[in-house]
């Protein structure tokens, strides 16, 4: 699972997901890509599940690029705990995804293979996505 080696602070504010993605919204490495259409937090587990789905389907052919990294820590309070006594303990890592963000890229395979692989990865994501091709 992906996570930062070290961070400056142990806990983080939740923040807002306003507007669309202006960085990471163009295909940079491969020929085909999966692009987010909605905003969401995507967990490290979901990123890994999508990556596995693509690599299993594409087998040895092609190369996969994961274009997002979970760098935001999410805290949770234990169940049936009273309010107060500080913020919860860090539980998992997420990547903040805005509409337009490229999630995965793939190259070196045919369009049909890429489309099916991306469809499998999209089913692991909590958001609507679209398949795009580099012009």
UniProtKB/Swiss-Prot annotation:
InterPro entries: Ribosomal_uL16, Ribosomal_uL16_bact-type, Ribosomal_uL16_CS, Ribosomal_uL16_dom, Ribosomal_uL16_sf. GO terms for cellular component: chloroplast; mitochondrial large ribosomal subunit. The gene is rpl16. The lineage of its organism: Eukaryota, Viridiplantae, Streptophyta, Embryophyta, Tracheophyta. Keywords: Chloroplast, Plastid, Ribonucleoprotein, Ribosomal protein. Part of the 50S ribosomal subunit. This is Large ribosomal subunit protein uL16c. Residues 1-20 are annotated as: Disordered. Its main location: plastid.
């Amino acid at each position: 699972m992906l996570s930062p080696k070290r961070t400056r602070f142990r806990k983080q504010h939740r923040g807002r997901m306003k507007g669309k993605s202006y960085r990471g919204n163009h295909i940079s490495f491969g020929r085909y890509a999966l692009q987010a259409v909605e905003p969401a937090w995507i967990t490290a587990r979901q990123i890994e599940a999508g990556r596995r789905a693509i690599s299993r389907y594409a087998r040895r052919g092609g190369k996969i690029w994961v274009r997002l990294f979970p760098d935001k820590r999410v805290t949770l309070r234990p169940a049936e705990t009273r309010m107060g006594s500080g913020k919860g303990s860090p539980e998992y890592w997420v990547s903040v995804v805005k509409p337009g963000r490229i999630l995965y890229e793939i190259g070196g395979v045919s369009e049909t293979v890429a489309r099916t692989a991306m469809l499998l990865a999209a089913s692991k994501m909590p958001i609507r996505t679209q398949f795009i091709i580099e012009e």
